[in-house]
Amino acid sequence: MIKIKNKELKKPIFQGGMGVGVSLSGLAGAVAKAGGAGTISAAQIGFLDPEFDKDPFEANLRAIKSEFDKARKISPDGIIGFNIMVAMQHYEEYVRAAVKAGTDFLVCGAGLPVDLPKIVAKAMEDMDQSLLAPALAPVVSTEKSARVIFRYWEKKHHCAPDFVIIEGPLAGGHLGFAKDQLSYYTFDVYEKEVRNIIEVCREYAARFNKEIPVVLAGGISTKEAADHAFSLGADAIQAATRFVTTYECDASDAFKKDYLDASKEDIILIDSPVGLPGRAVRNKFSDTIMSGGRIAPVRCRGCLKNCRPDKIPYCITDALITSVTGDAKNGLVFCGADAWRCDHLEYAEDVIESLLS
């Protein structure tokens, strides 16, 4: 049984964080209530705040607290956490805000969260010392990245991750692979990579005399895929795409409809201003970008550390907010490789049962 902050995970499933605004309190709370681990995406989480354009940083800080509180009302005793990208501006401040809000866990990817334990420890100093620190989980895609994290945390922070999320090449949104790696990592090849990462986790679990559960993510949209993940040695699975077409998902109906209407051929790779390939549903917006067009940013809301507004082909904040709020055809609709399999709306609890029954 996986334990997160002394709470037992009743169902071995994490709902993946999806931003901007796809997995907020509604979805995360519903998943936690159903026995899984619900994940709120911190990416531009305050986009609905009336003051967002004026001061996105402060709006995001307010929303981290308010979204967590709303999710906790839905699931008073469930496991609820945050996904916070390392590539975000104010990453450290957002981590501290999530800790102070009371998050059960933190999942950090889009870069290596080398100093996450230090940031969290500092945040905990200002809190009631009887409170438990959140569980910390890096997102890794290769054995190499896993070893880098484990070695660094051991040397600098004298600790190991509380669990690890392995994100495979079939995942949605930003991918931890270069485009040429995506063609290299066939199903069989990546299986070997998964087994190697699991071995790294087991090695350090023995070294630190603690359990380090492994959560496998990417393309897990059917019971068969879930069963296969467990057969490889995963302790739990993470699913995201399947949860988009749920009634509780925080995205607009138009966003969900893009999933429901998508064919297998509509799932494409698009370059992101983050510097990584991303997987998305093909639409008017993606056609413009992939044909060499540019949609110049109107304003900068400071979402990414290394963004050059004068150079990027589009503003990812604008593109994601446009789609999630209802204008899906003119925005970026991130998705997993199996989004085309989504053909009806359902409840989050039903998704969990269909994957784990």
Where are the regions a protein language model picked out?
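Conserved active-site-proximal phosphate/metal-binding subdomains
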Residues: 14, 171-215, 221-357
